[in-house]
Structure formats: structure tokens, C-alpha cells
Swiss-Prot record:
Species of the source: Arabidopsis thaliana
Expression sites by tissue: Expressed in flowers and siliques.
Keywords from the UniProt entry: Nucleus, Repeat
Motif Bipartite nuclear localization signal positions after renumbering to this chain: 329-345
Single GO term (MF): amino acid binding
Localization of this protein: Nucleus
InterPro entries per the UniProt record, alphabetical: ACR1-12, ACT-like_dom_sf, ACT_dom
GO (cellular component) term, any one: nucleus
Regulation: induction: By cold stress. Down-regulated by salt stress.
Name of this chain's protein: ACT domain-containing protein ACR1
Gene that encodes the chain: ACR1
Disulfide pairings: none
Cited Pfam families: ACT
Length: 477
């Protein structure tokens, strides 16, 4: 029998009116917990609102140690336990005000320059800039690819003002922001933009593999008004990687099967994803090594697949993160087939793995100049190293960036190669540390991992028992 589902059609103007009448209420609480700041958000529910909130905190490089999320379908209530990167509570009044304004404005047009100017610290720009032209590049990864791309851009007079590059499962995705190296400002001339695209196409097709399709997409940002194709850079990278199918053959660890003992399960830091039906929802459990922005990446994957998070809880025990989501499809359905569940598992594993810190992390800080990215990546390539992930941006006269490097086969870098890179780049390198993907945190006492495994129960079911008390406390804000 065919199942027919009816959904009410809500006019966008009415939906906007509801948001204006009931804007998000954000409370920053430094009294309830001695070790972290509680950010409590109470707002009208809207598809994608959870990702918008997590994005604000992630862009500030705040550490989310725990979070509780609940929705009754029309109203959304969240509590985030956060600290700064050093494990301290948030006490800066300008930062607290910025968080309150940014979460509210995320539903009404985004963060303004005035809001950023009032914040007494730098916020890394993770959105399309209205002063530059953005190029998106995806395709097969190979050693030296970023070096080739940046060299071509330098040769044709394009100044890279910011760039983010990810590699995963032999795929590469990049978002590069350019300005005219001769005249400054965005590249406006259509002929000039076409020229840049042609050169990038040539680089990507230089090692073309039969059956593969590489893409170079120009996304233009207008100098005035709302940018065309406005997007958050890291969200866009997730979308690009997903579009490239990097999630195929991404398998989670199966060490929870009968073949593995409790000791191994307790120590395993690989990615585990389990999905089961629970009270009209699909319950998704994620367990993996903790790292910065893990919550952002998993929520981003769920949003990309058009799932709605109704309830969730996330936290960490030592170096292990555990997350549990109660989700439905955007159309109200749940995951009914094993094929649907397997696809979600693959996509979550891919989203978590894309940002995994592979190799040695080189942090640079130097003078902003034409061809800087080309110079740095050339030195890395000429010393037999490969870049697995990179992020660079300019702040006035200064350029800062981080580059994760391995040998050409993806193995650990040798000390001689690293010394050569540091020597050639000179004072530009401010640190070189092994990227272990761990977030700084104060370590509290935890029970033995085996005992934790024996006592393992659904953290979501524990959450249900606290949900009524949580809802009451938030509504009293």
C-alpha cells in the first residue's frame, strides 16, 4: 500500500515573521559550572538552525566539551558547555556579546562587520569575502597539486588572499580567494576570470585519469550587496567532498562485534557509527577520537544529507568523543533500509575523517606578499613532502597559515626533510608539531576504559530522563 504523507506549506514571509517575533534567546552562564561556560539557546525551530549555532562557536575556535539539544518540532533548546583553547571559561564581555549577537544574526542575514569590529579579538574569516573572487576546485589529488595551482595563479598575476584545501580518499577540494595582483580588488572582468579558469583547468587535467571528472567552478562575489553563492568555506568544502563521492568505501570500525574483546573495544580510537530505530526516530551513535570541530563536522554531514536533528547529546571521556543523535529525514521519515543506514554511516565516517590531522603541522606567520602560497608550497614539494591539508589567510600586512605535510606516500616526514623546509622558509615557520588531532583540555579523572565499556549504556537514554528538567531550566531564562 502506498504511504502518503501530508506536510503543511508554510509561507516564507510568515516563517520570517515568527522569527522576528520570537528571536533566539541566548544566555551565557558562568555560574552553573566551575570549569566551563554554559551557552543556553532557546529559539523557534528552523531547518539548519543547529548547524548555524555550532558554526558560530566553531569559527571562534571554542572547545565544546558537552552539549544537550532538544526540539519539540516548533521550539529548539540547546545547552553548550564551552571553554577557550586553553580550557578557560569565557569572561571577555566583548566575546560574550559577540556570541549572543552572532547566534541571533545567523538566522537573519549573517554576521556584520560592525559586530566583528566590536569584538576585541580576531575572528578567522570563514565566509566568502566581498572583496575577493572565490574559486572552487575539486578533483583527483596528487603530490604537489596545491603547489602547481598556486604557481599558475602567481604567474598570471593573481594574489591569493586566503585558501583552504582538504584531501581525502585520493580526492582534493579547495576554496581559493583571489584578488587582482596588479590592480587589487576582486577580479571583475569576465575575460580575466575565464583566463584564470582556463589555467586552472589545464593544471587539473594535466594528469587526467580516464573516467574521472575534475571541476573548476568560479563563484563570483559581488562588491556590493549579498554575495552570489554565499557560503561558509568549511561547509562548502564538506559539500564539495560529498559531491566528489569521497565517502564511498569509508567504513567504520567493526570492533564491537563478537570477535573483539572488551579491552580492545575500550582502547580503540577508530570511528564507530551505529544506527537503530528508537521511538519513531533513527538513533545514531558516533564514537571516535576527540578533536576540535568534531561536532561541527558531524552536524554538517547530517544537514548535507537533509536530516533534521530533534534531540542530541555529545560529550567526551578523556580522548574519546561520544555523540548521539535522534534524527528524521526532512520529510519526516526514518532510515528504514540497511542501504540507507549504510550510506549515512559512510558519510559520517567521511565527514569526521576529512579534517583528521595527518602528518606534521607547519604553522607560518610572515609578511603578506604576492606569490607567498606558491613559495611555501614549492619549498614543501621540492623537499619531497606532500600537503594533506592547508589553510592560509591574510590579515592586512601579515599572512598566517597551517600546512599538514607527509612524505609522498602519506607516511611520516623524515627529520632531514623537515629541517630543510624550516631552513628554506626561515623565520616564516613559527612551529612544527605532529598533528595528532587532539584538542587542549583539562584532564579529569575517568574510570578505566574497560569498566566504561562494561557499564556502557545509551547516553541518549540518560538524556531523556534529564530532558524535562533541562527544558524547564531553559524556558526560565
Amino acid at each position: 500500500m502506498m504511504e502518503i504523507a501530508y506536510q503543511p506549506r508554510i509561507d516564507s514571509e510568515i516563517e520570517s515573521l515568527v522569527e522576528r517575533i520570537n528571536p533566539p534567546r541566548v544566555c551565557v552562564d558562568n555560574d552553573s559550572d566551575p570549569e566551563c561556560t554554559l551557552i543556553k539557546v532557546d529559539s523557534a525551530n528552523k531547518y539548519g538552525i543547529l548547524l548555524d549555532m555550532v558554526q558560530v562557536l566553531a569559527d571562534l575556535d571554542l572547545v565544546i566539551s558537552k552539549c544537550y539539544i532538544s526540539s519539540d518540532g516548533e521550539w529548539f533548546m540547546d545547552v553548550f558547555h564551552v571553554t577557550d583553547q586553553l580550557g578557560n571559561k569565557l569572561t571577555d564581555r566583548s566575546l560574550i556579546l559577540y556570541i549572543q549577537q552572532a547566534i541571533c544574526s545567523s538566522r537573519t542575514g549573517g554576521i556584520t562587520k560592525e559586530m566583528q569590529s566590536n569584538l576585541k579579538r580576531e575572528v578567522q574569516q570563514r565566509h566568502v569575502s566581498t572583496e575577493h573572487t572565490a574559486f572552487e576546485i575539486t578533483g583527483i589529488n596528487r603530490p604537489g597539486l596545491l603547489s602547481e595551482i598556486s604557481a599558475v595563479l602567481s604567474d598570471i598575476g593573481c594574489h591569493v588572499t586566503a585558501a583552504v584545501a582538504w584531501t581525502h580518499h585520493e580526492r582534493a577540494a579547495m576554496v581559493i580567494y583571489l584578488e587582482d595582483g596588479f590592480n587589487g580588488g576582486p577580479i571583475i572582468d569576465p575575460i580575466r576570470k575565464a583566463q584564470v579558469k582556463d589555467h586552472l583547468d589545464t593544471v587539473m587535467e594535466a594528469h587526467h585519469i580516464v573516467g574521472d571528472v575534475s571541476h573548476v567552478v568560479v563563484r563570483v562575489v559581488e562588491a556590493k550587496g549579498v554575495p552570489v553563492g554565499w557560503a561558509h568555506t568549511e561547509r562548502r568544502l564538506h559539500e564539495l567532498m560529498y559531491g566528489e563521492g569521497d565517502y564511498e568505501n569509508c567504513f567504520d570500525c567493526d570492533c564491537f562485534g563478537d570477535r573483539c574483546d572488551a579491552l580492545w573495544r575500550g582502547r580503540c580510537e577508530r570511528i564507530h557509527v551505529t544506527i537503530e530505530a528508537c521511538n519513531g526516530y533513527s538513533m545514531v551513535n558516533v564514537k571516535c577520537r576527540d578533536r576540535p570541530k568534531l561536532l561541527f563536522d558531524t552536524v554538517c554531514a547530517l544537514k548535507e544529507l537533509q536530516f533534521v536533528v530533534f534531540h542530541a547529546v555529545a560529550g567526551a571521556k578523556g580522548s574519546t568523543a561520544e555523540q548521539e543523535y535522534f534524527i528524521r529525514k526532512k520529510n519526516g521519515g526514518t532510515l528504514e533500509t540497511e542501504g540507507q543506514r549504510e550510506r549515512l554511516r559512510h558519510c559520517l565516517v567521511a565527514a569526521i575523517s576529512r579534517r583528521a590531522s595527518q602528518g606534521l603541522k607547519l604553522e607560518i606567520r610572515t609578511e603578506n606578499k604576492m606569490g607567498l602560497l606558491s613559495d611555501v608550497t614549492r619549498v614543501v614539494r621540492e623537499n619531497g613532502l606532500s600537503i594533506t591539508r592547508a589553510e592560509m589567510c591574510t590579515q592586512g600586512e601579515i599572512a598566517v597559515g597551517s600546512f599538514y605535510v607527509t612524505d609522498v606516500n602519506g607516511g611520516e616526514t623524515g627529520p632531514s626533510e623537515v629541517e630543510a623546509v624550516v631552513r628554506e622558509l626561515g623565520g616564516a615557520v613559527v612551529s612544527a608539531v605532529k598533528g595528532v588531532g587532539m584538542m587542549p583540555r583539562r584532564i579529569g579523572s575517568t574510570s578505566d576504559s574497560v569498566e566504561q565499556d562494561k557499564a556502557k549504556s545509551s547516553i541518549g537514554r540518560m538524556f531523556w530522563s534529564k530532558l524535562e528538567r533541562l527544558s524547564t531550566s531553559i524556558r526560565s531564562l
